[in-house]
Amino acid sequence: MKSSEIRQQFLDFFASKGHQIVSSSSLVPHEDPTLLFTNAGMNQFKDVFLGFDKRPYSRATTSQKCVRAGGKHNDLENVGYTARHHTFFEMLGNFSFGDYFKRDAIKYAWELLTEVYKLPKDKLTVTVYAEDDEAYDIWTKEIGVPVERVIRIGDNKGARYASDNFWMMGDTGPCGPCTEIFYDHGEKYWGGPPGSPEEDGDRFIEIWNNVFMQFNRDEAGVMHPLPKPSVDTGMGLERVSAVLQGVHANYEIDLFQALLKAAARETSDADLDSPSLKVLADHIRACSFLLADGVIPGNEGRGYVLRRIIRRAIRHGYKLGARAAFFHKMVPDLVAEMGMAYPELGQNQAKIVATLKQEEDRFFETIEHGMAILEGELKSLGEGGVFNGDTAFKLHDTYGFPLDLTQDICREHKITVDAAAFDAAMARQKEQARAAGKFKMATNLEYDGPATTFHGYAALEYKANVLALYKDGIAVNQLNEGEMGVVVLDDTPFYAESGGQVGDCGALQSVHGIFAVEDTQKIQATVFGHHGVVKTGTITVGNGVAAKVDVQARQRIMRNHSATHLLHKALREVLGDHVQQKGSQVDPDKTRFDFVHNQPMTDEEIRRVENIVNAEILANVATETRVLPIAEAQKLGAMMLFGEKYGDDVRVLDIGSSRELCGGTHVSRTGDIGLFSITAEGGVAAGVRRVEAVTGDNALAYMQDMESALGGVAGTLKVLPKDVHGRVLAVLDQVKKLERELAALKGKLASAQGDDMLSNAVDIKGAKVLAATLEGADVNALRETMDKLKDKLKSAAIVLASVADGKVTLIAGVTADLTGKVKAGELVNLVAQQIGGKGGGRPDMAQAGGTQPENLPAALASVAGWVEGKL
């Protein structure tokens, strides 16, 4: 049975049991700072389990894309060397949100494994938490698993409830026992059943974990029964495929065999058991799926983890003999294997290939030199040695070797890296200069009251009641005049920062005082915090207030946000469908839009984008918003952003020819935007460009400033504004002509001075020594004069100097017959050190500079004596 069939049978089975099939979420968790990447099927349902989110279904099933590389869950160093470690894997899961519990979960699991997948019952062993008698009885008395194959696992990790069979989301919150199902590969493999001293062997392999969330753990560690217990299960597709396909290692399943052959093809290595080929087969999946989900290689965060994975793959290809980009050529093989289940692979294939090749080309420029340094250090160390941390940092900083790549290579030689010294070197280089924003505080305030109802789509003023107040992150009953704090209301017209749109500002007014709102942020998904300061009087919990949004600021934000949607559509039209939003910031002054594109935009492309957006504005069409089921929105072709987390019902915005999912605030007609102008375009990361633009009155002011500046230049040049460009080109041509003439004159002057200097050359032991200053000579003139003097003097050591703007330029030259004794680099440094400078170069020609021209005469006078000592 193929892996694709196993995946589909799993989903179909649970659909037949009343489960909603939910698409895999992005590998980039949305609004969850605790996760670097999605690493389990339950991630997208976390808020449902915590009670912050509700779904229209109580049963769900998924095949979830997962990555474990970087952060707490990091399998990277083991990938390729073990049978079951991967950076990317698929997690099959079924979930109950307060619906069925242990009995049905266990029955479903057993039915699927033994009746649908037809696994032999005597090959399956299960574990339960030692105190979970309910699960134990279900397995033994209802399912009929022999008691010797139902193993109780207690607290085996050093603390109460610290067990392989007790799952906790965190130190507090939902938790509960779990039951795990193991497959016995047979006596030909070493290892014992779970709970035995030999449990880490390869005989008994866990294939499915069923977590029963039945408690809420408080800060004191007390377990309180949940009113609606839930179920969260996870089964690795790769592991169960290995079992069903009759192989022992995951790399032997159909999914990996095709990729191993692709890796062998691109590296000319026929050994499909090679750990390096396994690394490539694994890493092409992680890299391609991360790129498809919008992650871009970079130097921090998710982008840096992706770059580390790519470079680890390149290094293993290099180890197999690859000396040029090869890794990207495996992408079509992956798309052929998994593109049907995950269409985003095919949709983004061109971008994935281009980005990988760009990363490969960059690393192949430095890997050879880096490997030479690394291997040279390894040769000096014996087994058990310690690799120098400063050298590891040099490899990282100069040659692009991530630390774990160096550690990976050293591990193959049984050598460790001095990570502490590496960290110290890194710390010395970095300057920590991150200043938190004045009001970027208290998004983690403790609040358990009612949610905030948002009315800001239709109203900019609304009567509300104060539910809670915070000062310095602590709940208070009252804020007094001059005090900064956060206000929570039951109703609000203020938009809380989200989706790139900044939070609203304005005021909360009551008979007791005025609170100036300077920012609005989400405390929780549906609770808004109004950040600001009490301007007059007081504000107290329970007060009724008039919440008033700053109308001018909101209107500017709406113009900029609506223009951003039109900009996104125009960029895709002009540059291509590979353009994807990577980030945005919409505030009253401007819009900033980051997008995927591998090269700078031309002036013509910028002009075309502006024209498209302004044409939409002139059309003055009405905008339309609708709340639709996400499946219907997808059918309508609404653009969705990678990494965003969407609910089952979404807000669809139609503006001009653009259709996107968006929860922000927008103009009612495109004409309300007024005017659109791009003010800047540039790169922010590899493969990511940034456009900044202004709208409305800000765009008009920008145009007027540009017109004023152009008028000033036209006046200076004494031409009409329309003729400025041609006149500037003519002036530049004239400047270049004059510069050439000046250089020629300087050369003639220097040459003449050089001829005059010949008589000043001193004869020392048969060689001529000359040290002199040439007035008004630039570097080129000095070099030309040096060549002529060396040619005429035949055997000589010469230093020429020139002074301009308080700085000294030095050139030293030595004829070939003297370089064995007199080095030009040493000679030029002799003089440079005396005038506050330094330099270097070849034995026959060297250059330096200095900042103390007053010391130049004495420095030049020292040349003859120094040369005599060398001869």
From Swiss-Prot:
Statement: the UniProt record of this protein carries the keyword Zinc: yes
CDD domains, A to Z: AlaRS_core
Disulfide bonds: none
Keywords, alphabetical: Aminoacyl-tRNA synthetase, ATP-binding, Cytoplasm, Ligase, Metal-binding, Nucleotide-binding, Protein biosynthesis, RNA-binding, tRNA-binding, Zinc
Source organism, top-level taxon: Bacteria
InterPro entries linked to this entry: aa-tRNA-synth_II/BPL/LPL, Ala-tRNA-lgiase_IIc, Ala-tRNA-ligase_IIc_anticod-bd, Ala-tRNA-synth_IIc_core, Ala-tRNA-synth_IIc_N, Ala-tRNA_ligase, Ala_tRNA_ligase_euk/bac, DHHA1_dom
Binding-site residues, Zn(2+): 561, 565, 662, 666
Gene Ontology CC terms: cytosol
Pfam families, alphabetized: DHHA1, tRNA-synt_2c, tRNA_SAD
Subcellular location field: Cytoplasm
Co-factor binding comment: Binds 1 zinc ion per subunit.
Enzyme class: ligase
Cofactor(s) required, per the database record: Zn(2+)
Catalytic activity annotation: tRNA(Ala) + L-alanine + ATP = L-alanyl-tRNA(Ala) + AMP + diphosphate
GO annotation, biological process: alanyl-tRNA aminoacylation; negative regulation of DNA-templated transcription
EC number per UniProt: 6.1.1.7
Gene Ontology terms for molecular function: alanine-tRNA ligase activity; aminoacyl-tRNA deacylase activity; ATP binding; tRNA binding; zinc ion binding
Ranges in coiled-coil conformation: none
Family: Belongs to the class-II aminoacyl-tRNA synthetase family.
Entry domain remark: Consists of three domains; the N-terminal catalytic domain, the editing domain and the C-terminal C-Ala domain. The editing domain removes incorrectly charged amino acids, while the C-Ala domain, along with tRNA(Ala), serves as a bridge to cooperatively bring together the editing and aminoacylation centers thus stimulating deacylation of misacylated tRNAs.
Stated role: Catalyzes the attachment of alanine to tRNA(Ala) in a two-step reaction: alanine is first activated by ATP to form Ala-AMP and then transferred to the acceptor end of tRNA(Ala). Also edits incorrectly charged Ser-tRNA(Ala) and Gly-tRNA(Ala) via its editing domain.
Official protein name in the record: Alanine--tRNA ligase
Organism: Dechloromonas aromatica (strain RCB)
Gene that this polypeptide is encoded by: alaS
